[in-house]
């Protein structure tokens, strides 16, 4: 059996209750997605340039950006049914499409994963503000994992906000 394909989740997919409610509404099992650990999608920033009919406002996307930018999120494993459900939830391939990415775990390990990115035809050239409820789902998911929310707050207000990493700590560099 091959190695698992990991899913990098960001945005509302960081909220377990939102995922579970979406699954239950469709008679599906939410345990088809299991969290592994927190992770960062490097050289990307979050954008709100897509209007979700289901959310009634802007929905999160990740876009390739300058070196030193990063989007916090989480790595998950999905069963085959989990991938089918996630594809359906994300409107794959018409709204969001699967994209291979490399993420860095909180432990510093580089991991190959798949995430979902908004199709160019669905992107708007202006900021599409999310609802307060949708932003709260994302914020709560980040806070639960002790991940920063500054990038989220900026991207809600500015289309071209940068999710810049402005500090680095390297283990083993301290001397006594």
PLM regions and their residue ranges:
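Glycine-aromatic micro-motifs
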Residues: 2-176
């Amino acid at each position: 059996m091959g190695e698992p394909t990991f899913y990098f989740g960001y945005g509302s997919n960081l909220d377990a209750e939102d995922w579970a409610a979406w699954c239950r509404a469709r008679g599906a099992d939410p345990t088809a997605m299991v969290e592994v650990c927190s992770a960062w999608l490097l050289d990307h920033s979050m954008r709100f340039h897509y209007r979700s009919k289901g959310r009634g406002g802007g929905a999160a996307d990740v876009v390739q950006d300058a070196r030193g930018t990063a989007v916090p999120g989480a790595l998950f494993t999905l069963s085959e049914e989990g991938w089918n459900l996630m594809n359906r939830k994300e409107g794959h391939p018409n709204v969001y499409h699967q994209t291979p990415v490399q993420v860095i775990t909180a432990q510093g390990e580089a991991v190959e994963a798949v995430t979902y990115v908004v199709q160019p035809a669905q992107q708007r050239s202006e900021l599409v503000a999310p609802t307060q409820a949708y932003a709260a789902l994302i914020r709560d998911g980040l806070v639960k994992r002790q991940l920063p929310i500054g990038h989220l707050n900026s991207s809600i207000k500015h289309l071209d906000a940068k999710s810049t990493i402005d500090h680095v700590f390297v283990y083993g560099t301290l001397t006594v």
